[in-house]
Amino acid sequence: WSTGYMYRKSSMMLRAGLAYEYALLSGQSTFPTSEDLGRSFQNVLPSVMLRYEFDDSKNIRLFYRTNTQEPSVTDLQDVVDNSNPLSLESGNSNLRQSYSHTLMSRYGAANSQRGTSFFAMVSTTQTNHYITSSTFTAAQDTTLENGIRLLSGGQFTQPVNMNGYLNSKVFTTYGLPLSFLSSGLNFNTTFSYTLTPGQVNGQVNKSRSTGLGQGLVLSSNISEKVDFTLSYDGSYYIVKNTFQPQLNNNYYYQVASARLNLILPAQIVFRTDFSHQLYAGLSDSYNQQYALWNASIGKKIFSEDRGEIGVSIFDLLGQNTSISREVTETYVQDTQTEVLGTYFMVNFSYNFRNAN
């Protein structure tokens, strides 16, 4: 069920809405005991949007939105996962639905004579009853209130609701033409701040992650036969914890890339892309850099160049590595994933066109 109101006058538009949400979660546990895990959640979700146009090239939009997130059936299941005796996990049947408020503003401006554009976005999300983790580490053999037996050094983790989650973002981009290169140049700046609450041995831990990034993109507009893009993106992150300062960490991540597409005589098509990634500040074995280079060559065939046959080679340098970092309220995890490596592919494509 929802209702709304809209007001429009010349350069301004206001829209307000109110929605009633009813969510039904169904689940049934059969082992070790039979248990109905079904839950129902209901909430009222207001929203407001204001748009104002200064002129044909400048406008601003303001948003207020609300949304919810239900716990999963696994989160609600009071069953201990003891597949790892030193790291036990369980659900929590008392979990509530989280409720978030989001404020957002967007501003855009364009100058058609100069060919420039500017865009800025600011958003903040605050969440009540945020679903987070509570972790207890036993200093000695311990029996918890719920009867769970923990060996010395063992951990018990379960989801809980906590207030105080906050996520703020700022994004700006500015674009301008470079006529001498028949290209366009875009600069972008990002800022992020995330506050994630959690519990460690009954104490509140607040993990604060602050990030600042800068990027630029040079893209061509030469012709249909020559197309290239150069880009760079670098981000620096600062992670601080109130209860676990040993998890505090600063790290840097950057990607520089280039892409080139050419249509040569005799309808030969050459494509290549190259990227260089750098990680600094991660765990010792993860601080590394690598380059990824792909290339392909093919030929357009059939009438109107509808078909193309070619050969593609991926990871020519054999350096591809998948690395990621996850920052949570209770731990920081660096992950390296095995990838396929160098390989090639023969491909064929055909473009079906409607005569109408």
What is each PLM-predicted segment?
Residues 1-51, 56-102, 124-152, 183-193, 216-219, 223-238, 316-330, ...:
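Surface-exposed extracellular loop regions of Gram-negative outer-membrane beta-barrel proteins
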Residues 278, 287, 299-356:
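C-terminal beta-signal and adjacent terminal beta-strands/loops
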